[in-house]
């Protein structure tokens, strides 16, 4: 254990301020970051890592992008927080509406975290419908509100408050539309909303089967329940209009975060104004936040979204993904090792299971011990993946060919080492 991490453990529970950072799922001492630039971070021991976590998907442009940094420095001279509506909020809202192609009957409410945004979306659904039940899907993560933390690894850490929330939340298997439809046929009149990730990123990367997302949204329309698409991970990452655009769907409520803030804390709820105008002060559903719409986060977010709009940005990301991951897939296929590499856009996961998972139960069949050995080997070579077998890793536009070539070789060598192919 490093000296700094020992000191961190004196001050923070588990030495961290968010649990997965402790790296216990991969059985390593977590690195303590000293600085970061582009696709790498350097730890307190002066070791360089190629970063495929990127602040859990927030840094699609890499660390310390010069345009984002310059805008923040300039904005800081005008003030770090106002507690009032600012010009920066309005300009950023205009940018988002243009980028997402939102109609004029939509509105947005800025917040600071994804958890705040999902909690607000659920509060809207319950407040407007007067119904108590929220449906989510097993393995999908929507923040740390008790409403969302039903299944492992979260349930055993949430004690009595979670038990009180359980009767109001139903968790169903992802991708099982017949079961979902059966439940909605029985309980739909009590369901305020259904919240879902369009592409799962917190049980590893798991894709929806054909027509699942469309079916969920259509069923919500039929029962008068709100469909809530959590695009905290996929928004601004998988396409200009997010996953909603890729799947050609129109959920009732959209939730954004991560990339939205350009590396600073920002999130948002977006919906038609007949929904959003139920929020205070226009309506009676309360939501507030001291740092909501923080001017520096708005500035960083606006630059981040502008960079995503540059010609060929998503084509560039797709090329990076293809060049980096295809040779690894080829190695897995030709050697016959029991590993599945799942990728979607610039998200990817290694499942130590020969079969592609469709839900949490499938993902949990993975060989966790083998994943840990793989992770530890890659980490020792300076490749930092998201430190859990059930978390997505991320590519960014900042990943250079040199870094990708090195990481590709390191990951292949690590797979060979785990399965004694060398």
From Swiss-Prot:
Cellular component terms (Gene Ontology): cytoplasm
Primary location group: cytoplasm
Pfam family, one: Aminotran_3
Highest taxon, organism lineage: Bacteria
Cofactors, names only: pyridoxal 5'-phosphate
Record keyword Cytoplasm present: yes
Pathway annotation: Porphyrin-containing compound metabolism; protoporphyrin-IX biosynthesis; 5-aminolevulinate from L-glutamyl-tRNA(Glu): step 2/2
Protein's cellular compartments: Cytoplasm
InterPro entries: 4pyrrol_synth_GluAld_NH2Trfase, Aminotrans_3, Aminotrans_3_PPA_site, PyrdxlP-dep_Trfase, PyrdxlP-dep_Trfase_major, PyrdxlP-dep_Trfase_small
Keywords: Cytoplasm, Isomerase, Porphyrin biosynthesis, Pyridoxal phosphate
An individual GO BP term: protoporphyrinogen IX biosynthetic process
N6-(pyridoxal phosphate)lysine found at: 258
Entry's EC annotation: 5.4.3.8
Catalytic activity: (S)-4-amino-5-oxopentanoate = 5-aminolevulinate
One GO MF term: glutamate-1-semialdehyde 2,1-aminomutase activity
Class of the enzyme per the UniProt entry, highest EC level: isomerase
PANTHER family noted in UniProt: GLUTAMATE-1-SEMIALDEHYDE 2,1-AMINOMUTASE, GLUTAMATE-1-SEMIALDEHYDE 2,1-AMINOMUTASE 1, CHLOROPLASTIC-RELATED
Self-association and partners: Homodimer.
UniProt similarity note: Belongs to the class-III pyridoxal-phosphate-dependent aminotransferase family. HemL subfamily.
Protein name, per record: Glutamate-1-semialdehyde 2,1-aminomutase
Originating species: Chlamydia trachomatis serovar L2 (strain ATCC VR-902B / DSM 19102 / 434/Bu)
Chain's gene name: hemL
